């Protein structure tokens, strides 16, 4: 384990062999239990019985129906998270068998998500509260102006049920096509893409405006953020050309984030990118609240824009991302229910999180290659430099002069192998 201290990576004592052995044994036991829980939901008979016994049909407003069949489609099966799609077929309890055979059976697709860490119930409760405070679509046919019409097209996947004994959550399946696929497949006019990106800005403003009951939502943890950025710094620091620069940028990002006033924090999605957004006609639905928490709203804005920049480069898109970013932020600002000052300060922090996202991309894409012993499996030098420069540009636009001086000081001192004195900037 390591941490960034004055711009350098400091190594802590590792666990003893005995501690590691106990941790491994505990993990293996939990993995066996977890595997068993997930396996249950891959069995059609179990699923049908479970859903009937858990009164699922009443939650789907199908109390007068029974489950005829269940088609199971595992989307992702992992030790830390599994996602399974269920296509259920129903028949009316009141109709005779002959009538049921003649009529096309009613079907519905729902999605189950399992995770072993116990946060599933917390996520489900959060989804329910958010759903009832702005996304339940009740009265959707009663709107009589353009603003309300836009509001009702901004949707959330519906929380249906949670089974605490199995750590299993059921939600509706988002309809339509992923915004990411619309970007990558290049089969949609750019004007339509731009329309949905503006919708995404309105969706974020809608989410960020929701006031939640106290005590029920996970708050952003500075400790977890420090651990994450420390890990990135340690892993990327071995790059011969940009290791020191990345360390300095991450150190500066941490310093800035520590100084933020939590009074500006709101409910954020914390994973808002085109892969979690589905478009169906004029409807836009967002999924995956697994990392949602109370934190800086600029996180969602910066991450979404950074993902657009990444998609443009990765898939050679013709989108004018700079223009889209400007319009995206303007749309968010016009829809946000914040004071003018708070909105302005939020938008000013977007570059901070774009820089963080670019470094996150470097870590995700090149960490294993950096540590590979094979000379044939090293990072693409042009691409690596591109993302370092993008992060640097964002920080240079945003950072206060004092922070820029700190970065320069770190770089100079590192070249001489000495520790910088940053007390003058505190």
Predicted regions and their residues:
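Acidic, serine/threonine- and proline-rich low-complexity regulatory regions
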Residues: 338-351
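ATP-binding pocket architecture of kinase catalytic cores
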Residues: 89-97, 103-215
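Juxta-kinase regulatory segment immediately upstream of eukaryotic protein kinase catalytic domains
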Residues: 2-20, 24-72
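Active-site acidic catalytic loop and adjacent metal/ATP-binding pocket
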Residues: 73-97, 105-106, 167, 254-299, ...
């Amino acid at each position: 384990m390591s941490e960034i201290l004055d711009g350098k990576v400091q190594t802590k004592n590792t666990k003893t062999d005995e501690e590691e052995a106990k941790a491994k044994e505990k993990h293996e036991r939990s993995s066996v239990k977890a595997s068993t829980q997930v396996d249950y939901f891959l069995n059609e008979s179990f699923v049908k019985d479970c859903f009937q016994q858990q009164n699922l049909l009443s939650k789907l407003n199908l109390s007068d129906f029974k489950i005829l069949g269940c088609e199971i489609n595992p989307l992702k099966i992992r030790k830390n998270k599994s996602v399974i799609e269920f296509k259920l077929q129903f028949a009316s309890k009141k109709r005779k068998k002959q009538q049921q055979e003649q009529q096309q059976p009613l079907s519905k697709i729902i999605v189950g998500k399992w995770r072993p860490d116990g946060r599933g119930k917390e996520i489900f409760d959060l989804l329910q509260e958010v759903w009832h405070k702005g996304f339940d679509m009740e009265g959707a046919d009663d709107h009589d102006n353009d603003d309300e019409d836009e509001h009702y097209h901004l949707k959330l996947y519906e929380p249906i049920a949670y089974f605490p004994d199995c750590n299993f959550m059921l939600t509706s399946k988002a309809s339509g096509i992923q915004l990411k696929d619309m970007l990558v497949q290049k089969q949609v006019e750019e004007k339509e893409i731009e329309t949905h990106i503006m919708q995404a800005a309105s969706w974020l403003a809608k989410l960020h405006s929701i006031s939640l009951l106290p005590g029920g939502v996970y708050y952003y943890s500075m400790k977890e953020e420090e651990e994450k950025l420390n890990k990135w710094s340690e892993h990327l620091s071995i790059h011969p050309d940009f290791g020191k620069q990345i360390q300095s940028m991450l150190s500066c990002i941490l310093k800035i984030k520590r100084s933020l006033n939590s009074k500006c924090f709101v409910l954020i999605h914390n994973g808002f990118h085109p892969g979690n957004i589905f478009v169906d006609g004029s409807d836009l639905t967002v999924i995956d609240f697994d990392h949602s928490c109370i934190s800086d709203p600029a996180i969602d804005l910066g991450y979404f824009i950074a993902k657009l920049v990444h998609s443009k480069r990765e898939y050679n898109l013709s989108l004018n991302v700079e223009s889209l970013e400007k319009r995206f932020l303007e749309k968010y600002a016009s829809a946000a229910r914040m004071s003018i000052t708070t909105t302005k300060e939020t938008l000013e922090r977007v570059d901070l999180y774009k820089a963080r996202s670019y470094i996150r991309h470097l870590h995700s894409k090149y960490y294993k290659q950096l540590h590979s012993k094979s000379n044939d499996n090293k990072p693409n030098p042009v691409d690596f430099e591109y993302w370092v420069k993008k992060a640097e540009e964002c920080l240079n636009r945003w950072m206060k002069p004092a922070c820029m001086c700190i970065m320069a000081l770190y770089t100079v001192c590192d070249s001489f192998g000495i520790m910088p004195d940053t007390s003058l900037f505190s």
